[in-house]
């Protein structure tokens, strides 16, 4: 059975001339193929983790650091960093990566919604991913975290190469609308006590 949190939005990126997968919040993807993994990040974070020797890599896209249900058990959903990081690493290892060869590049965690500045979700996500990778002794080779801008990210898992574009939004509220939509979706799908 295919994990429903495994990204499935495949397309051909004509500008980059390569097969691609677009990751939405709460998704992850692992591959050995020559392709690009892409996403757009606001307050969310993506960890791009790859094995430099076996050339296998993957990426996740999570919305919040972690969550627990009313019984104190972690919620197994890739929208939350704890689960998203764990499943990405497990899938990399299951597909042939070796723990000692894993390295990471991390992006996102912007505080892009004025209303969210007080809760600083982006900063919480950024701190979480750095702490998680340090605890698992996976070095961070590069990253672009926090700030006030959304980012468009392209990750080439076989080589570890990243293309990053900061989206300087002036009158376009698309990212903010998406962030609000995903936040509402998150609240409606995670029920207390589950």
Swiss-Prot record:
The lineage of its organism: Bacteria, Pseudomonadati, Pseudomonadota, Betaproteobacteria, Nitrosomonadales. It is an enzyme of class 3 (hydrolase). This is Probable chemoreceptor glutamine deamidase CheD. InterPro entries: CheD-like_sf (IPR038592), Chemorcpt_Glu_NH3ase_CheD (IPR005659), Cytotoxic_necrot_fac-like_cat (IPR011324). Keywords: Chemotaxis, Hydrolase. One of its GO terms (biological process) is chemotaxis. It catalyses: L-glutaminyl-[protein] + H2O = L-glutamyl-[protein] + NH4(+). Probably deamidates glutamine residues to glutamate on methyl-accepting chemotaxis receptors (MCPs), playing an important role in chemotaxis. GO terms for molecular function: protein-glutamine glutaminase activity. Its EC number is 3.5.1.44. Belongs to the CheD family.
